């Protein structure tokens, strides 16, 4: 049987990398996004996940065997994050029910599973590190948990297997997608080089000195494909990172060197929203 993938969020960093990988490996790939993915081998589908009727209409005739949920929508509060993002997962999994072909659904979440939502990110007592997949949930409301609950309920109802993938900060190539730390830092460094401004670290003292890691979109795509096609990986959660642990105080000077500029010493908070407030014309 030919594997038919439905990649939700196909124009994003993760979704576009995954769509290309699956198409290259001979999968039939449908890419769902508000801004359709036009890569070779990907059938574009334009739909809004919060509109159940329009979503069902857009998916008419699509019979996915494997679904990859790689998108989310940030809202003004965690309560809204929970409501909106849970509804997006619920609507999608309801829309594919009539086809009756789904065998596996993969959900991409992330580090906030362990550190808490935006409103409480990294505050209070942190869980034991390194983070392990079997660690229990934090005692806070979290839209990642709401997404998981929708996935688990649908899997029990419809009989498909699932996997949850928890990357750290994801970097990769996605044309037109601004939610990409690599692109953001490249633009910021380029502006600093153009204007002669100091290349200041925009994060906190804790971030500067703490160990961290990242996830390459290609690495995550390969992991998603593996989990979706490996029976032993069914019904499990996975942390997915590159494995090269670093500190920003070490990395910052290396980014500066790449762009031919000097790295400024850490001198307190310097949010990019403030540093780049007047840079629209550059």
Where do the protein language model's features map onto the residues?
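Conserved Rossmann-fold NAD(P)-dependent oxidoreductase catalytic core, especially the SDR/UDP-sugar
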Residues: 67, 87-143
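N-terminal Rossmann NAD(P)H-binding glycine-rich loop of SDR-like oxidoreductase domains
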Residues: 3-25
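Glycine/proline-rich active-site loop of Rossmann-fold NAD(P)-dependent oxidoreductases
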Residues: 158, 172-188, 218, 226-238, ...
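NAD(P)H-binding glycine-rich loop region in Rossmannoid oxidoreductase-like domains
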Residues: 37-38, 46-91
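Glycine-rich Rossmann NAD(P)(H)-binding loop
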Residues: 172, 203-211, 238-245, 256
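Active-site Tyr-X1-5-Lys
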Residues: 134-168, 173
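A conserved pocket-lining segment of Rossmann-fold NAD(P)-dependent short-chain dehydrogenase/reductase
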Residues: 187-215
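Mid/C-terminal beta-alpha module of Rossmann-like enzyme folds, strongest
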Residues: 221-282
